[in-house]
């Protein structure tokens, strides 16, 4: 069958070549022309791409379209095509050698840019003539040479006699030609680069043409000799020459001798390249200086392997091995004198290097096209011997050499069939050197130090070793031991693929046999690292369970002291096997049981260790972190969970959590979050698979079992982790972010798998957890904000809770958000005075918390309840969701507007209840700001927000349900005990906060007083108390009206354009002033009288004065004018008097106000007799403003004069009458008449 197949292939190839002969032309070696075949590795004119090699092997006409004319021109002379070689062979070869000489002569000419074009043309012409001649020889042999019958005694024609001698003549001439041209290695060095002229044509120096002509000659001589043998089917003897053994020269001996010489030349050229290359770059460097030399290697491979297959001759590898063995033995005396002497500084390295490069040439087929599927002849026998020499213990083996050798060996494993013997030879070496680090002093140490950092990195190393394609930088990145592991992996995988488990059993037996108790006890730390690398790789490529079991048995041989010192490494190795089990979806039960028990013991040690024992704690923590990281990888890697996964989550975690400090807790909680995320992801996948249609009972049963396993693992997490989180809600031990994240993950787990939650959380585990971490007022706001952000992000959870009807999910969430905003300047709630103290408000809040608050605000504003409030209030909110404080202000305002728009009593009542639910215990939220430590930013936030709340929700606070909260807000913020102590100064930050927000409170309280469902005397009293306290506290030090513009009480009146009850607020202010600031204690005037008079004056300037206010305040003003002589007081009192009189004129027509007249009448009665001079002076001022007021008082004034004179009993009081007359003089005719009556009165 094989012969039939070969014959079929032969016929197909022959037919293909016969059909494609129109392009045939003499091929030659060329690297000067770009590939024209599109993706070809050799030039289109090459022997490979032109099909010349294939024609030679298939015994076809070398050039079917050439030399078909009767005559041809060679070396400038016309010859008869069919007879030239017979009649003139010696002449033609002489002309050939003459052309060679001419080309060699051109080398002596200087090759500058001006002459290069001429020299290139001459040299190229000579080369083309020479190549054409040799191709003619080939064609002549194929077409015209006749095989003579040597036994025939019939007389022959002289031409036939000459023709019979032609083969021998050719042998002689070819041998002479080879002697003439000598060795390739003896040619002068050639620069492969070319000149490029203006037409982009490459121009080469004569030396380049000479080299390539020599290549052509060497190859074409082999072709001619091969064709001669194929044509004649007999040995052809030369007449003139004998070989080195004194035997007659034949076509076969000349062919073999020339092959040997040519291979020696190619080896010598390669050696020149190798000596210039570093070991680290040897496989990345090109072996051939020129593409044509590479082509010559490929041609020799095909030709020699073809001869060995069909004739009794040696294969290409045998030829090369024979020469390399001579090189390795360093015995030049064995070589013939005609052979070039080859010496190398590193014969072993060179042998590896050239075999590896030459092996890569086998991928090219007869057309020069790479064929990865082509069957490649291996050379393992020689490589095995070479490998034994490379690791011989007789000499010192350098790691840098060994890396290069093994890198070559690994590359050969890619090319050739697997060879178990190679692994065996290498293992014999490495088994004895396991304790070596295999490092190179001048290279950075990248091997085991990085590999053993973690179990995952150990597996990554194994994965890298098992890759089909290795890194070109393997020499620098990996030790020779790692490269050995790559070889081991590649050989075992390829062998098992082709031969089943038998090769693995061979390798396993060899490796296992080297490990026993004594050997295990001899291992150092490095040895143990190499041990784990080896067995992990074996597990990866073969039977993981068998290997893991054997490793556990071997580890039991280690000494206890060594186990203690190297426990971290042993744990890493153990965990690496556990990870491999998970990656291969195997049950981890056997490994998990033992490992988890060891973890529990170490967690217990960690719990009882003292904080002072830092070294011991660090040692134990290293082990625990290996376990934690590894178990996380196991869960993330596992395709599905088995009951054995639950074993990994034992009560060791409960002990560990109690012993951890913050940095350690971060690690454990990160692990928890990763495992929770994995469990939820796997549960969702199971649910999707269960919901598919047409799930058969077997699959359904399997999925149900998987779900039970998941539930068991989830229950373990609840049991060992959640109780700790619950206990740490109010402590600062657990980082806020991780506490919130972990709690949120448990919340989502409870949503997905509610039955796994503890019994005390049933039947609503999600609600129970949210109450603990989201709605509990004692939890730190940083935790609440982050936790609720996670919850609100899950739309499924929000939708379910919003429609559950179990609790007011949205309202309680809004309440927590309000608390988070109000407490943004509080670090934690463990102490009432633990605040963030910072001068800059923006910097006072941690950036991370502010980001979280912004995120929570954005999510909260997407709740349907919140959207509804803003929609009903027609308030825009999207633009301010990035600023939590502004967002809270807008929310308070929106609630107030929404309530104002509600029509029915039932809806109003429900809205009040909901609003109060939003606030919760709002005073508790702000209480930390009101402690002993005074914090400006916190106070500003508190008073500002509460002021907006009081004003915006005034109508809500007017209801009986909400009034109690209003009373508490006022008492807590505006009328605390410290404020009531007049002699005690309030802290400046507190006063500043009150000053900014007081107008809001006053306006809101005023609205409440006006709209209260039940008139409340206490509320009015509160309003009066607030006004009374803060009028005085914010009076300026100097009594100037201009300084009173920003008084908060006046601002409350000024900013109430949209509030109807302004008059009631002003009325209350006036009453407070009358009662508390213009009240004399005996004859002593009230304190800060000038400032209060300035305040009253500013009040009248900014508002419309009512007669009722005049009636209340004017007596006090008049009293100041009478009793106080201080100039400022008199000036301010006079100005107030003027404003009041003018104000009373507005609205009264010709008649003065009766109330105003009444006030002045009482004033005259009270002070007219004793302070008549002051009274008359005051009334003079009034008369200048409004004569009618004083005219209406004439009778009272006259009566007061008479009563005074009568009281004193001294007759007329001349001084008083003069003063009175002066007043009357300002009253026009009525005054004159009264003066006359007084003169006429003799009483």
Swiss-Prot record:
Q: What name is this protein filed under?
A: Protein MMS22-like
What is the species of this protein? Homo sapiens
Consequence of substituting residue 1034 to A: Abolished interaction with RAD51
Report the domain of life of the source organism: Eukaryota
What Gene Ontology molecular function terms does this protein carry? single-stranded DNA binding
Q: What does it do?
A: Component of the MMS22L-TONSL complex, a complex that promotes homologous recombination-mediated repair of double-strand breaks (DSBs) at stalled or collapsed replication forks. The MMS22L-TONSL complex is required to maintain genome integrity during DNA replication. It mediates the assembly of RAD51 filaments on single-stranded DNA (ssDNA): the MMS22L-TONSL complex is recruited to DSBs following histone replacement by histone chaperones and eviction of the replication protein A complex (RPA/RP-A) from DSBs.
This protein's GO cellular component annotations are: cytosol; nuclear replication fork; nucleoplasm; nucleus; site of DNA damage; site of double-strand break
Q: Which UniProt keywords apply?
A: Chromatin regulator, Chromosome, DNA damage, DNA repair, DNA-binding, Nucleus
């Amino acid at each position: 069958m094989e012969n039939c197949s070969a014959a079929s292939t032969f016929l197909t190839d022959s037919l293909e070549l016969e059909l494609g002969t129109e392009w045939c032309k003499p091929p030659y070696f060329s690297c000067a022309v770009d590939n024209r075949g599109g993706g070809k590795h050799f030039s289109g004119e090459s022997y490979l791409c032109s099909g010349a090699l294939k024609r030679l092997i298939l015994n076809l006409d070398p050039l079917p379209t050439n030399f078909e004319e009767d005559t041809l021109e060679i070396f400038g002379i016309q010859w008869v095509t069919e007879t030239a070689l017979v009649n003139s062979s010696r002449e033609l070869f002489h002309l050939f050698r003459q052309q060679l000489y001419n080309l060699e002569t051109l080398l002596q000419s200087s090759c500058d840019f001006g002459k290069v074009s001429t020299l290139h043309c001459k040299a190229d012409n000579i080369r083309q003539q020479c190549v054409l001649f040799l191709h003619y020889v080939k064609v002549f042999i194929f077409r015209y040479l006749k095989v003579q019958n040597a036994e025939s005694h019939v007389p022959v024609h002289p031409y036939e006699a000459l023709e019979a001698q032609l083969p021998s003549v050719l042998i002689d001439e070819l041998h002479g030609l080879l002697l003439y041209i000598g060795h390739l290695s003896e040619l002068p060095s050639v620069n492969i680069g070319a000149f490029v002229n203006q037409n982009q044509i490459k121009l080469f120096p004569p030396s380049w043409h000479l080299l390539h002509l020599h290549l052509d000659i060497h190859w074409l001589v082999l072709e001619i000799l091969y064709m001669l043998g194929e044509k004649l089917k007999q040995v052809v003897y030369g007449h003139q020459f004998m070989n080195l053994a004194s035997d007659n020269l034949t076509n076969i001996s000349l062919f073999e001798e020339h092959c040997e010489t040519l291979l020696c030349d190619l080896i010598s050229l390669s050696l020149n390249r190798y000596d210039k290359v570093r070991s680290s770059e040897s496989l990345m460097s090109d072996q051939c200086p020129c593409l044509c030399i590479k082509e010559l290697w490929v041609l020799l491979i095909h030709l020699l392997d073809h001869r060995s297959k069909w004739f009794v001759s040696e294969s290409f590898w045998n030829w090369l091995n024979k020469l390399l063995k001579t090189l390795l033995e360093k015995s030049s005396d064995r070589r013939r004198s005609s052979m070039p002497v080859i010496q190398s500084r590193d014969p072993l390295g060179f042998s590896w290097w050239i075999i590896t490069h030459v092996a890569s040439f086998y991928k090219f087929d007869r057309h020069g096209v790479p064929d990865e599927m082509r069957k490649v002849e291996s050379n393992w026998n020689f490589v095995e011997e070479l490998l034994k020499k490379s690791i011989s213990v007789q000499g010192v083996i350098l790691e840098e050499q060994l890396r290069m050798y093994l890198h070559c060996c690994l590359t050969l494993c890619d090319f050739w069939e697997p060879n178990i013997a190679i692994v065996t030879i290498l293992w014999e070496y490495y088994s004895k050197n396991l304790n070596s680090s295999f490092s190179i002093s001048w290279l950075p140490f990248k091997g085991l130090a990085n590999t053993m950092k973690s179990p995952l990195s150990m597996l990554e190393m194994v994965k890298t070793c098992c890759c089909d394609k290795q890194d070109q930088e393997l020499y620098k990145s990996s030790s020779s031991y790692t490269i050995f592991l790559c070889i081991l992996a590649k050989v075992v995988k390829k062998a098992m693929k082709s031969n089943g488990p038998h090769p693995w059993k061979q390798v396993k037996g060899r490796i296992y046999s080297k490990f026993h108790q004594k050997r295990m006890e001899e291992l150092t730390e490095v040895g143990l690292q190499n041990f784990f690398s080896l067995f992990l790789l074996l597990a990866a490529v073969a039977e993981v369970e068998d290997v893991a079991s054997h490793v556990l048995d071997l580890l039991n041989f280690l000494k206890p002291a060594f186990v203690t010192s190297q426990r971290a490494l042993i744990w890493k190795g153990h965990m690496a096997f556990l990870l491999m089990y998970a990656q291969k979806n195997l049950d981890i039960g056997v490994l998990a049981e033992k490992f988890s028990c060891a973890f529990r013991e170490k967690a217990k040690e960690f719990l009882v260790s003292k904080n002072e024992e830092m070294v011991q704690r660090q040692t134990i923590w290293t082990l625990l972190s290996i376990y934690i990281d590894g178990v996380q990888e196991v869960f993330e890697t596992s395709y599905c969970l088995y009951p054995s996964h639950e074993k990994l989550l034992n009560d060791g975690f409960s002990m560990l959590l109690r012993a951890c400090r913050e940095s350690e807790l971060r690690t454990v909680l990160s692990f928890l979050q990763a495992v929770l995320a994995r469990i939820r992801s796997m549960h969702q996948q199971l649910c999707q698979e269960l919901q598919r249609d047409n799930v058969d009972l077997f699959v359904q049963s399997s999925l149900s079992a998987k779900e039970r396993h998941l539930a068991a693992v989830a229950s373990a997490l609840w049991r060992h982790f959640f109780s700790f989180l619950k206990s740490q809600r109010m402590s600062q031990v657990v980082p806020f972010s991780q506490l919130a994240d972990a709690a949120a993950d448990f919340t989502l787990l409870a949503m997905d798998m509610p039955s796994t939650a503890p019994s005390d959380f049933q039947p609503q585990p999600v609600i129970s957890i949210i109450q603990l971490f989201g709605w509990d007022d004692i939890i730190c706001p940083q935790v609440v904000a982050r936790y609720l952000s996670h919850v609100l992000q899950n739309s499924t959870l929000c939708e379910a809770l919003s429609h559950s009807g179990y609790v007011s999910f949205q309202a309680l969430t809004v309440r927590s958000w309000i608390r988070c905003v109000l407490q943004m300047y509080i670090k934690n709630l463990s102490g009432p005075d633990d605040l963030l103290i910072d001068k800059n408000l923006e910097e006072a809040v941690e950036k991370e918390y502010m980001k979280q608050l912004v995120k929570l605000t954005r999510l909260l504003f997407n709740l349907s309840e919140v959207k509804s409030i803003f929609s009903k209030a027609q308030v825009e909110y999207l633009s301010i969701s990035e600023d939590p404080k502004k967002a809270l202000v807008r929310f308070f305002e929106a609630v107030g507007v929404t309530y104002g728009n509600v029509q029915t009593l039932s809806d109003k009542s429900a809205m009040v209840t909901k609003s109060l639910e939003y606030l919760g215990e709002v005073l508790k939220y702000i209480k930390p700001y009101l402690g002993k430590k005074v914090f400006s930013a916190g106070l500003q936030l508190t008073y500002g927000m509460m002021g907006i709340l009081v004003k915006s929700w005034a109508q809500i606070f007017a209801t009986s349900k909400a009034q109690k909260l209003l009373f508490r807000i006022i008492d807590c913020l505006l009328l605390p005990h410290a404020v009531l102590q007049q002699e005690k100064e309030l802290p400046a930050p507190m006063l500043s906060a009150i000053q900014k927000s007081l107008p809001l409170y006053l306006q809101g309280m005023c609205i409440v007083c006006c709209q209260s469902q039940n008139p409340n005397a206490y509320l009015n009293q509160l309003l009066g108390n607030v006004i009374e306290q803060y009028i005085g506290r914010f009076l300026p030090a100097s009594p100037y009206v201009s300084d009173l513009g920003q008084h908060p009480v006046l601002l409350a009146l000024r900013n109430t354009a949209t509030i109807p009850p302004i008059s009631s607020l002003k009325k209350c202010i006036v009453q407070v002033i009358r009662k508390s600031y213009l009240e004399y204690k005996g004859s002593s005037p009230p304190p800060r009288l000038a400032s209060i008079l300035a305040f009253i004056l500013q009040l009248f300037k900014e508002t419309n004065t009512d007669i009722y206010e005049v009636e209340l305040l004017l007596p006090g003003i008049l009293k100041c004018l009478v009793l106080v002589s201080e100039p400022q007081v008199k000036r301010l009192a006079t100005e107030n008097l003027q404003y009041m009189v003018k104000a009373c004129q507005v609205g009264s027509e010709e008649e003065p106000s009766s109330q105003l007249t009444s006030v002045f009448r009482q004033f005259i009665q009270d002070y007219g007799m004793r302070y008549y001079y002051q009274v008359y002076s005051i009334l003079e001022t009034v008369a200048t403003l409004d004569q009618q007021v004083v005219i209406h008082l004439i009778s009272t004034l006259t009566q007061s004069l008479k009563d005074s004179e009568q009281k004193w009993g001294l007759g007329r009081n001349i001084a008083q009458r003069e003063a009175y007359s002066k007043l009357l003089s300002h009253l026009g005719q009525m005054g004159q008449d009264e003066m006359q009556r007084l003169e006429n009165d003799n009483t």
